[in-house]
């Protein structure tokens, strides 16, 4: 871990801020299988060949072996975490760990209040499918009421603990236990699909209310190690929760599915290490909760991380999280907030410069990956997105098919966009720009929106114009405007 990077940042934000690791922090050690690299990538069969070439060219052109390198203002890379640094989502996986083990520190009388946090009143009666085969729809407020009532029963039985417990046969047979898990995970999906991301992204972090940062870190690290281990929870399968039919509730039964498995591949570990070995700093900018991300950096031994900015809630006087986002530190680290957080927290350490490399996968990363003038290269993990991430996927394929390399793109004032595919059924990269999504048999490529962007570029539109004409994010400041 680059201690200078941490010290520089702590000088800007107080020592109790998002970058003070949990007490259990130890220096990151790199997996033995990841070699020391200078200006070249190993594992070439597992990187898409155009991606491999682009990254190598980036290191050669902007790393410390380049004659143009100035170490007084080091270039830096900014990585999203979920579905970018990692395959699949660490916080969604932690939610399953929490629910199965009832790892909460919320008082039973406060649970309903916590679950209501941030949800606009006019959205409480919003409905979402129960997905139990009945075709019925369920009100958000009814599911919240049920989950809070279930929690009181489970808490009274002594099954709720901060660290969580291995579920017993008695717990598994409990109707309230079954319903609580189903309603909580259903709410996560329902809120995410029916409300703005500024509501849904922080909502799941309020589950840590009552915990200290170190308690969240330790809980998350245990989850990461379990679901990142192919002999344990890393099954690359889908599971589901279903409410029982023999429990009287306001919402009635619901069913919800979830994914099992997370990893950080040897190729991604290598990329972090390669960048650092060539004088390029690396940062994480994530919409997951900050302690959850810090724990993942350690659990997966990600080398050379200079800093983490992520979702952070306020602490009470006893040092425990409350259900309130800490805007005093920075904006929510999603969408526009990822860019403003770079401007507030990271760029001042680099004389105001933006990231030279951006790594992303989805709508929440679109702003920071396209708005900064200093960004030379954008690495996109293909999930066949239909949101604004489809725009950059379409640009990447246009540049690839027209043999536009890094030097040419940068000379034209553009970033080079690179599209990397992967196999989510076994947690690996492969030499393809297509992705096999979890549970699917056929690969996914470009969404209709991405194909539209590629077509418009073929007709002669500029990258700036296709972004402006196709983006749905009204807060996007424009291509290379920061």
Give the role of each language-model region.
Residues 33-46, 50, 56, 60, ...:
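C-terminal cap/substrate-recognition subdomain and adjoining C-terminal extension
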Residues 1-3:
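Short amphipathic, positively biased membrane-proximal segments
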Residues 91, 98-100, 105-255:
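A metal-dependent, Asp-based hydrolase signature
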Residues 80-81, 86-89, 166-167, 365:
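N-terminal low-complexity, Ser/Thr- and acidic-residue-enriched intrinsically disordered segments
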Residues 82-84, 90-91, 313, 383-385:
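Solvent-exposed coil/turn segments that connect beta secondary-structure elements
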Residues 5, 9-81, 89-128, 132, ...:
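Non-catalytic pre-domain segments flanking phosphatase-related domains
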